[in-house]
Amino acid sequence: MNRLNELSFIDLILEDGFAEIKGMKGANSYLTDLPEIYQGDASELRSVCNDIHIRTQKTEFSLRYDGRIYRVTVIYHEWSGTSFVIRQTPENILPFTDVPLSTPLRSSITRPGATGLCLIAGEMGSGKTTTAASVLRQRIEITGSLGVSIEDPIETLLHGRHGNGRCLQLEVGQNESYSTATKKALRMGASCLLLGEIRDGQTAHEVLKASLTMFVVSTIHGSSVYDAIDRYVMFCEEINHNAKQNVANTLYIIAHQTMTSVRRGDVVAGRNISINAFNLVNCTQNAAIKSKIMQGNYRALQDEFNGIEYTL
C-alpha cells in the first residue's frame, strides 16, 4: 500500500465515498481525486481522525500520522455526514535561506534586542505558518534565546534545540488559552514568541500585549499588507478601543505572502512563494508610518512603502 507521506500536497478532503486532494505535486489540476493507490492509507487516516473527533469532540486538532503532522478540520453536514479537511505540514522547518526576504528584512529578524510584531499575512493555504516557524527558529538560533510557540492546534516542528537557543511548544485547548499560555511564556523568561493565527479579538489582544516587550511572530488572513494592518487593528479594537497607538508603536515587520502553482505542461510541478515585506521601525519613514497607522489611514502607507529607506 502506498503511503500519503510520499506525497507533497496542501489539503486532503476525506468523506464517506470520496477522497480529493488539493495542490498535489504531479497532478494535472489543483483539486483532483486522490489516486487509487493511496486510498487505503487515506481510509486509515480518516479512521484515526474520526476516533480523535469522537473521543475529544474537537472540530480542529493536529495529529502525527506515519511520521507527518497533519492539521485536521472537522465538518459535519446533515446529509453527507462527517468530512475531514486535512492540511499537510512540512516534514521539517523550512530553512530560512529558502524564505524569499530581502537582506534588510533578514537582518531585521535577527537584530539583537529587537521587539515588536512580525505579522505575516496571506490567503488560506499560502504557507504563512511555514514561514512564521522558519522566522522564529532563525531568531532563536542566531540570538541564542528561549522561544515559545503557542498554537491552536500545534502544526510545526519547533519544539527542541535550535543553535544556541531552544523552543518550547504550548497547545491552546480546553485547559489552555492564549492568555494563560502567554503568561507561562513570560514566566519562563522567553524573549521571542510565535502566537498562532490571529482570528479573533482575544488572540489579537494577546499578540499586542506580548509585542510590547518581546519579539513576536504571528499570522493573519489578508489580501495585502494594508488589509492585514486593517484587520489586525480591527481585532485589537474589539478589546482595546484605543489600540491604534499601541499597534503603531509595536508593529515591527509587516509581510504579505502568496503561493502559486508551478506548472510544467499540464502537471503541477511545485509551488512558488513570494513575500512582500517591510520593516516599519528601522527606516527613515518611521514617523510617517506611525502617524498613518494611528489615523487609520492604511492605504496611504503605499507612499512610504514605495520609497522605503532602511537605516539598519
Task: List where the protein language model places each region.
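Short, flexible helix-loop junctions that flank or precede catalytic/ligand sites
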Residues: 1-66, 71-312
